[in-house]
Amino acid sequence: MQKNLTRWLLTCCIMVVAMIIVGGITRLTDSGLSIVEWRPVTGILPPFSYDTWQAEFAKYKAFPEYNAVNYGMTLSEFKFIYLLEFVHRLLGRATGLIYILPLIYFYFKGIIKNRDILSYIIVLLLFCVQGFMGWYMVKSGLVNHPSVSHFRLAFHLIIAVIIYHLLFYKLVKNCCDILLIPSQINLKLPLIFSVAAIAMIYVQIFLGALVAGLDAGLIYNSFPLMGGNFIPIEIKDNFISFKNWYDPVFVQFMHRLGAYSLSIIVIALIISLLKVKNPKLNKVAFYLSIALLIQLSTGVITLLYHVPIIAASMHQFFAIVLLSVVIWCYSLIKNS
């Protein structure tokens, strides 16, 4: 039965990652405001007939995005953005069901013990918060300025990442072997660096969402400098101000700084793992190197080529991959 628990956790992790990636594509294609109602139960089926499609299109036309951004859009074009948002919402519903139904079964079968149930309930509550946060985010764009709040977008993403983190950590603990390392070997430094790396990845994901929300990837499409300067001229004289977090230039600059900081932390983690001279930790160090390299490369490509959807989606995906490898590393060390 433990194998069934492992398969369930793996399925939930895959579903959450799919939801994150589809959500990212929804943002990149400006599809998020195409469904202007929140119907958690009755909205599980898309329009099928011509009349129902026209009715949904009419609802969309009543909100500012149509007139300000997509005036003259055809029904076929509307169907594309509508179905992307619909798939994103459907994935959210499906993931919730795939989580809660087996959870009830595993608990009453005694596979999930009473001592562990609280953490699973926390994940369930986060799913509920995530659904509300998604609508709260969409609602922010159904106004005169048809653009969702970049802060709400960032929190919507972070909640999804937290859900994934909790599920993946349980998965790793459930199926990975314990590290057999002599007691005289000190793993304190790798543990500290792994915690720091996890924290910095969260910061970077949050900043990345702010970049996406402000379309900040469409400016200063050069690397490593921004307009010939390390610190762009727009923020040199006014660096410490909360208003900067509404400025695409500042947010992009902070995301770049975050990338440099994360790289230093992950490289330090890799070096500390290699010094232990343990085959399993050496394997983790190798995977960390690959994940970091791909993550940095996709980030630079996304910037240089003005945010192509495939590159941006890969960049988001490998942020989750990098987080996963660091969580695996942390779990191995913590539970050794």
Swiss-Prot record:
Pfam families: COX15-CtaA (PF02628). Its EC number is 1.17.99.9. GO terms for cellular component: plasma membrane. Pathway: Porphyrin-containing compound metabolism; heme A biosynthesis; heme A from heme O: step 1/1. It is a multi-pass membrane protein. The chain crosses the membrane at residues 5-25, 92-112, 117-137, 153-173, 191-211, 257-277, 284-304, 307-327. It is an enzyme of class 1 (oxidoreductase). Keywords: Cell membrane, Heme biosynthesis, Iron, Membrane, Metal-binding, Oxidoreductase, Transmembrane, Transmembrane helix. Its main location: membrane. Its cofactor is heme b. The keyword Oxidoreductase applies. It catalyses: Fe(II)-heme o + 2 A + H2O = Fe(II)-heme a + 2 AH2. One of its GO terms (molecular function) is metal ion binding. GO terms for biological process: heme A biosynthetic process. Heme binds at residues 255, 315. It is found in: Cell membrane. Belongs to the COX15/CtaA family. Type 2 subfamily. Catalyzes the conversion of heme O to heme A by two successive hydroxylations of the methyl group at C8. The first hydroxylation forms heme I, the second hydroxylation results in an unstable dihydroxymethyl group, which spontaneously dehydrates, resulting in the formyl group of heme A. Interacts with CtaB. PANTHER family: CYTOCHROME C OXIDASE ASSEMBLY PROTEIN COX15 (PTHR23289), CYTOCHROME C OXIDASE ASSEMBLY PROTEIN COX15 HOMOLOG (PTHR23289:SF2). This is Heme A synthase. It comes from Rickettsia bellii (strain OSU 85-389).
